[in-house]
Amino acid sequence: MVDVIITGGGPTGLMLAGELRLHGVHVVVLEKEKEPSGHARALGLHVRSIEVMDQRGLLERFLALGRQYPLRGFFAGITRPAPGRLDTAHPYILGIPQNVTERLLAEHAIEAGTEVRRGCELAGLSQDDTGVTAELADGTRLRARYLVGCDGGRSIVRKLLGIGFPGEPARTEWLLAEA
């Protein structure tokens, strides 16, 4: 039995895995995709994420593969706070594609002792007084004390548990091109 199963090998799941390993927790990450994505998806890290990477000793890896952009002090037409007044040692946005972020976080989690299983899709789960049993699409079962769903907006964990997604979908459309 492992301590924690994390479903989802994106930035959230991989960062959580690394954090748990720092505390000696036995972690397995299940990612349904067989190979890492080659697509950018998201394009960068904001100040607080950069600060966390620095606190964990990971920032140099990110800086080596990203590009720093000065902060701009606006969001949805709001011009405050002024960037020069933010209390941070990192007054920039780091342009770095999500697939690179995921690779760096996976390397860190694996170096810390996390087992990352790719091509493993969660198909079912059951819970009792001693933990959780995860059933994978191939019929394999894995037992853990806890299971954490870090599997995104279309979360299979949330669906299996009957947890709704309250609120409304975003009304903003974006176009991202890799040219």
Task: Indicate where each model-derived feature is located.
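Beta1/beta-strand and adjacent pyrophosphate-binding region of the FAD-binding site
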Residues: 1-12
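Core beta-strand elements of the Rossmann-like FAD/NAD(P) dinucleotide-binding domain
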Residues: 2, 137-146
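Short hydrophobic core segments
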Residues: 7, 142-152
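Glycine-rich FAD pyrophosphate-binding loop
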Residues: 21-42
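Active-site-adjacent segment of FAD-dependent monooxygenases/related oxidoreductases
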Residues: 38-110, 126
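A conserved short coil-to-beta-strand element within the FAD-binding core of flavoproteins
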Residues: 118-132
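Flavin (primarily FAD) binding-site architecture
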Residues: 149-163
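Glycine-rich loop(s) and the adjacent beta-strand/alpha-helix scaffold that form part
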Residues: 160-179
